[in-house]
Design a protein with these regions (language model features):
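Basic/charged alpha-beta structural segments of nucleotide/phosphate-handling enzymes
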Residues: 2-144, 159, 166, 180-186
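Structural recognition of the conserved hydrophobic beta-strand(s) that form the central parallel beta-sheet
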Residues: 150-151, 174-179
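Histidine-anchored nucleotide/phosphate-binding helix
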Residues: 157-173
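Conserved P-loop NTPase "ATPase switch" module shared by AAA+ and STAND
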Residues: 145-158
Length: 187
């Protein structure tokens, strides 16, 4: 046999935007671009810096550190497929004063942040990735590809990745290779 003529496309599931043209196709054209992560941290840090915790002003380094934590929380809510709607409601009104500070932080990312992102015509990177993967699932369910699709090494820990794995398993040439399974002899 001869030499291979073309290498397979092997994108990483975490970098959905990186392989848009060949894999995701036109689904991403309707979505706003992902906001730069550093810009998001800096915008949130500015919002946080105007706050006080326990009556003390938040310093710029503290604001940046807290903005990173808020971004992580925002990403985790998006990755889980959950909604932030009820998160602030878990804090009872009759708890200690410091819970009010926590509620202020939650208000920044769940009430003020969506408006800021909309004004800038961008969306959170994790949310965009989840929507792109969902669009790819819809596309493959309606028009299964004629070529093999293999997902290797993913545990499906994120809801969007799990949905993609289920879609790939239903494809005529879809395969999932789970990480860490011992080699088993065929009999």
């Amino acid at each position: 046999a001869g030499q291979p003529l073309m290498l397979p496309a092997m994108p990483a599931l975490g970098d959905v935007d990186e392989f848009l043209p060949g894999i995701i196709g036109a689904q991403g054209d309707d979505l706003p671009p992902a906001m730069d992560r550093v810009e998001r941290h800096l915008i949130l840090a500015r919002l946080i810096q105007g706050m006080t915790i326990g009556g003390r002003a938040i310093s710029p380094p503290q604001a940046l550190s807290l903005s990173i934590s808020l971004c992580t929380l925002l990403d985790q809510v998006s990755q889980s497929g959950g909604s932030p709607d009820g998160l602030a409601d878990i804090i009872p009104d009759d708890f200690a004063h410091h819970w009010g500070d926590i509620r202020q932080f939650l208000d920044i990312i769940f009430q003020r942040w969506p408006d800021i992102a909309a004004q800038k015509h961008v969306m959170d990177p994790v949310q965009r990735s989840a929507l792109l993967l969902s669009a790819q699932c819809d596309e493959w369910q309606q028009n299964p590809p004629a070529h093999p699709v293999i997902i290797a090494g993913s545990t499906g820990s994120l809801s969007s990745t799990r949905a993609l794995m289920k879609t790939v398993m239903a494809l005529p040439q879809g395969f999932i290779v789970l990480p860490g399974l011992p080699e088993m002899p065929f009999s």
